[in-house]
Amino acid sequence: MSAALLSLVQWLSPAFPTGAFAYSHGLEWAISEGEVRDAASARRWIADVLAFGAGRTDAILLAHALRGHDPEALSDLARALAPAAERLRETEEQGAAFAATVAALTGRDLPPRPLPVALGQAAAPLGLPVAEVLALMLHAFAANLVSAAVRFVPLGQTEGQATLAALHPLIGEIAAESAEAPLDALGSAALRGDLAAMRHETQEVRIFKT
C-alpha cells in the first residue's frame, strides 16, 4: 500500500479531528420521529442520502476539486447546494477543521473551504485515482452516519457493521459515476433527508449538532 493512500486513509479516519462524530446530517430527527427505527430503515435512509443527496453532490465536487477546478467556484457551489443552515454549518465546520489539520501536518497553505473542496485540494497532490478517493470519502461519510444510528436508534455493533457492508456496492457505483460527472450533473433529490436537516434546527432535545 502506498504512502499516499495511507495518508488519505488517515485523513478520512474517525480519529482525524474534523468533529464528524457530532454531525448526524438530520438523521437524529429521522430517528426521533420513528422514520429510522432499525437496521433496515437506517440502511435505506443512508442509501438515499448517498445516492440522491449530499453523498453524490459531494463526490462530484470532490472529483472536480481533485482535477484542479477553481476552488472558489466549487466552494460557492457547495454552499449553494446546502439545503439547510445546519447542512451548511456541517460542511463548512468540518472542512475548516480538516484543512487546518492537514495544513499543520504537511506545511501546505490550505484555506478553510466546504469539506469536499478542502479534501480535493488536500488530496490532489497524492495522485490517487479519482474514483478511489471518492469511494473512500463516501465510505467515511456512510460510516459516520451508521455510527450515529448505532448510538441513537440504537443498533447493535454487528448490525451497524452489516448495514455499512450492505452499502459497499452502492458506494462503488456512486464513486465510479461521480468521477466522470460534469458539474451540470449536480443536484439533489433526497427530500426527506433535507427536510430532516431543516427540522433538526428546531429540535428541542438533541445530542448532535446537525
Curated annotation (Swiss-Prot):
Localisation per UniProt entry: Cytoplasm
Alphabetical keyword list: Chaperone, Cytoplasm, Nickel insertion
Residues spanning the signal sequence: none
Superkingdom of the source species: Bacteria
One of the record's GO molecular function terms: nickel cation binding
GO CC aspect terms: cytoplasm
Subunit structure: UreD, UreF and UreG form a complex that acts as a GTP-hydrolysis-dependent molecular chaperone, activating the urease apoprotein by helping to assemble the nickel containing metallocenter of UreC. The UreE protein probably delivers the nickel.
Annotated function: Required for maturation of urease via the functional incorporation of the urease nickel metallocenter.
Family: Belongs to the UreF family.
Protein name: Urease accessory protein UreF
Gene: ureF
